[in-house]
Amino acid sequence: MSKNPLTAACVILSVISASALAGLCVFALKNDQLTNINTKLSHDKSSLSTSLSEAQAVISELRSKAETEAVTEPANENTVYIYDNGIDVIEYPEIEGALFNDYDMSLLETDEKKHKALFDRNGNKRSRFGIDVSSYQQNIDWQAVKADGVEFAMLRIGYRGYETGQLCEDKYFRRNLEGAKAADIDTGVYFFSQAITEAEAAEEADYVISLLAETNARLEMPVVFDWEFPTDEDPARTEGLSGDVQTACCRAFCDKIREAGYEPMYYSTINTAIFRYDMGVLSDIPLWLAEYKADTSFVYDYRMWQYSCSGVVDGIEGLVDLNILIES
């Protein structure tokens, strides 16, 4: 994937609240145009209503302005802007060294079960459909999963405890590995990290490498560093960890994995990728993006997209995460 310096324009993502504005508009505007529109929105804020027709009129006006006015030199060629609720403008920090993707989401197709596929302009499929599972899915009928069109599975191999920091193997990893292989489903693994130092991240990588050797696992998919903030109210050892340290932990884990002969990858939401990880430092490591939407306007490079946490797949009781792997 080549770098896109965005020399023609800044990218503006219009994220509109469901109660006031619906839809998402991407605009190419120079900096003074952005200022003018933001001023207009501020003046109009008091008159906005929940009427969908009025909201769409505002969107149409902004789109028309973006398309008709000349765009010359942007104030910052690597800046990405977001409209938040149609009023406030959030400026993404410039990410030196980050790569951009060339995916055309207008060519994304979704079937009745929410299974997605991305195509190129020649009609060729450029994605593969997959799931990620852990002990939460419990017993899985992998033959039924295969018959439902699943081409790959990312298996949780282990995790580090929120509070104790103890390294643990996912209790369903071995049976999931055996079942997926028997069904001829390509497999990769992810480790749920709570590392707070580079040394701990390297320890996690060594733990994963040891388990892969012990189970004689042959992987067709990456080994993923999955660092997430706890979602419950229990105290976590990762509280207060800086983005720089988190980036260093990811780097340490992925370097170890690569040295062992596996393909590394890191998992992240949009907010974590942009505002915590240094994507420039990690530009040689593929990103597994998590965004639960019908499509994604994420401009930076990613290889895998987790688009749903409430998917339905034959052979699995309950819900499961759905993904597509985008091939070059």
Task: State where each predicted segment sits.
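Functionally critical loop-and-helix segments that line ligand-binding/catalytic clefts
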Residues: 77-130, 280-328
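Substrate-binding cleft of extracellular glycoside hydrolase catalytic domains
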Residues: 123, 127-247, 258-260
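N-terminal Sec-pathway targeting helices
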Residues: 1-17
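Long, heptad-repeat coiled-coil alpha-helices used as oligomerization/scaffolding rods
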Residues: 13, 17-20, 27-48, 52-62, ...
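A short, gly/pro- and small-residue-rich
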Residues: 38, 173, 304
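Generic detector of short, locally flexible boundary/turn motifs and exposed helical patches
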Residues: 91-98, 116-121, 153, 187-191, ...
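Surface-exposed substrate-engagement region within the catalytic domains
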Residues: 217-328
